[in-house]
Amino acid sequence: MLIGVGTDIVQIPRIEKILNIYQELFAKKILALKELKQFTLLNKTNHATFLAKRFSAKEAVSKAFGVGIGRGINFKDITILNDNLGKPTVEISSHYTNKLAPFNIHLSLSDDYPICIAFAIIESNC
C-alpha cells in the first residue's frame, strides 16, 4: 500500500553559495554521521552536488512521509547512502520508525548542473 510520494528540486549554485559562507557547518547541520564520513572523503569540487542531492533526497523523503523536515522528522533522522551499484538507499532513525508500521522507501536522485532532483515513494510492508 502506498504511504506517500515526495519530490524536491535544488539549485546546486544555491548550495555553492551556502558553502562559501558557512563552509562545512552546513554539511554538519544536514548530514547524518555516515554521510558526513563520505562527505569528508570527497574532493571539494564535489561537495556542493553531494550536499544538494542529500538535501533534496531528505526533503523528498520527509514529504513522502507527509510531514516535511522539522515537523516530526529532521535532516539527521534520514541517512542517504548508496549500494554497491550506486543506487541510493535510505535509513531512517529508529526513534522515528518506532512510531510507524514497517515500510519500504524507494528513492531516485538525478543531477544535471545547475539542478538536482529527488523523488521518493514510501510503501507499507503490511
Curated annotation (Swiss-Prot):
Localization: Cytoplasm
Cofactor(s) required, per the database record: Mg(2+)
Keyword list, A-Z: Cytoplasm, Fatty acid biosynthesis, Fatty acid metabolism, Lipid biosynthesis, Lipid metabolism, Magnesium, Metal-binding, Transferase
Claim: Lipid biosynthesis is one of the keywords in the record: yes
Single GO molecular function: magnesium ion binding
One Pfam family recorded for the sequence: ACPS
A biological-process GO annotation: fatty acid biosynthetic process
Reactions it catalyzes: apo-[ACP] + CoA = holo-[ACP] + adenosine 3',5'-bisphosphate + H(+)
Record flagged with keyword Transferase: yes
SUPFAM superfamilies assigned to the protein according to its UniProt record, in alphabetical order: 4'-phosphopantetheinyl transferase (SSF56214)
Signal peptide: none
One term under GO cellular component: cytoplasm
Positions bound to Mg(2+): D8, E59
HAMAP family: AcpS
Its biological purpose: Transfers the 4'-phosphopantetheine moiety from coenzyme A to a Ser of acyl-carrier-protein.
Protein family according to the UniProt entry: Belongs to the P-Pant transferase superfamily. AcpS family.
Name the record gives this protein: Holo-[acyl-carrier-protein] synthase
Organism: Rickettsia prowazekii (strain Madrid E)
Gene from which this protein is expressed: acpS
